[in-house]
Amino acid sequence: RKYFKYYDEISTWQMQHGCMNEHEAFTFYQNSYDFNLEKGLWKDVGEYGGTCDALSADYGVDFKCPTSLDGWLDYIFTGISKQQYNQCQMYMLLFDKPLWKVCAYLTETEWMIQRELSYPVPADKRIILVEVQRNLEWEERLIKNTPFVIEEREKYYQILCDQFGTPSTLIKEQVLITE
């Protein structure tokens, strides 16, 4: 991203489902749990940065829209993934919150809608919440490992420059190609 100034979102149909339904999940949560919930924003803190889904005075929320009933129920029986846990920890660091909530919101997929299928779960029970507490030891490990990660990022960046030229050279070449 730093090199090409381009962010290539990994786009699977599951991620598209989540993006398409995030606003619905936000509105449902806001109306059911916390009228003061606000849309998230981008925040930088030193070398770290991220965009959260939603913020309240004392906590943040990350919305997940699973694409199957089993995937949704996993939030009850197995909790969140390690990746989701790390995401919550990073958001708590960035936004200085003691608590983050993962909100698993069940909504039909496009395939189901086209076939007029519906999950057998009442509309008012379609949220599963998993709470994550801030972990200061996690933050200490992150801070300790950051110099190594930045060093490796810079090596990667240099390899791209060696292979393709500097980013400014790429931009000039793109302009010439499009003219």
Where is each model-derived feature located?
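Accessory terminal regions of nucleic-acid processing enzymes
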Residues: 1-179
